[in-house]
C-alpha cells in the first residue's frame, strides 16, 4: 500500500510541474508584431521614419487553402499552362480577391529571375502607409542565397550579412543600391522593373532586409532602420499599440483570416464630403446636404477602424471593427452603424448598400462587442456572412469563372478608396 501511494504521489508531482502548452499566436498578430507602429498624420505630414494612412494584410497561403487550391505555380505564366479549372480557381482565390495596392499588383507579373523568389514563397503580405512612406513586408519561405544573387545581379550591394547562428537564429542580409541605403527615394524611370514588388513605380530601389522567413523594404532609410529594429526585436511593434492590438485580436478571435485592413477615422472623412464628391456640380447639392444632415445620427468617435475577411466553418465572414476605450460606446456604435448600413445608399453606384450585399449573398448580422483581455479595450464588430463560394455568383460579370473569396472585403475597400463609406463617418 505504501508503495502504491508513493507511485501516485510521484505521478501527481509530475502532473503539477509539466507546463501548459503555449497558445499559438494567430498569423495576423504574429505578422503585425513585425511592423513599425503607426502615427495618425495627414498625407505629406508623416514624420520621418514613420508611416500613416492604411495597412493592408493578405495571407496568400490561407487564401489558397480555404478554396481548396492545390496548385502552387511559380508565377502566373506557369499558371496559364494549367487546366482552366485550376487556373481560374487559383486566380479567384488570390488575384481577384486581393486589395488593390501597387505592390500586390506587381505579384501578377512577378518574375523570379528578377526578384529572387516566386509565388510559392509567399505567406503573409503587409503593405503599410501612403507613398512615398509606404513599406512592404512579405513573410514566407525564401532561399536567401538565391535572393542575394538576384539582387546583386541587379546592381544591389550587400551592406550587411549574418549567417544562421548555432542556436537556430535567422541569417539576414541588408541590400541597398550602389548609390547607398539613403538613396531609396531616388527616381530612375529607366530602371523600373516590371514584376518586382520591391521596386518603386518610378524605378526607386529601396533598401531591403532579407531572411529565409521574410523580406522587408521601404524607400525611406530612417523608416527602414526602425523597421529592421522591430523585426529584430529591438523596438516596439504595431502590436504594442493597444488600439491596433485590440482590432487585430477582434478580427482573429474566431476567424481563419484571409485579409485585413487597418486605418484611422480621418481616412473615412465626413458624410458631407462623400455627398459632395458624388454630386459635383449638382444644382440641388445644398438641398441634398440639408436633407442628409437632418437624418444624421452621430456615433461615438472611434480610435481605429479595421476591416477583416476570413472563414468560419463554411461561411465567409466580412467584419467592420471599430475600437473604443469602453464597451458601452462600442455597443452603441455597433447598433447605429448596423442601422445605417441597412438604409444607406452607395453614392458611387447610386444603389442601396442592402442591395449590394444581397447581390453577393451577404447577410448583415447583429452587431457584437469584443473586449480584449490583453488591453482592456473594446471594439464594435459588425459582420456580414456569406456562403464560401464554389461556383459562379455573378455569371455576367465573372465570365463563368469562380467568384472571388472576398467580395465583401473588396466592396468595403473599394468604398474606402472612393470615400463611399459614409455610414462609418463620425461627423457630418
Show where each model-derived region lies:
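Bacterial N-terminal signal peptides
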Residues: 7-16
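Sec/Tat signal peptide C-region and signal peptidase I cleavage site
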Residues: 18-22
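Soluble, non-membrane globular domain cores that form compact, hydrophobic packing
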Residues: 23-133, 139-428
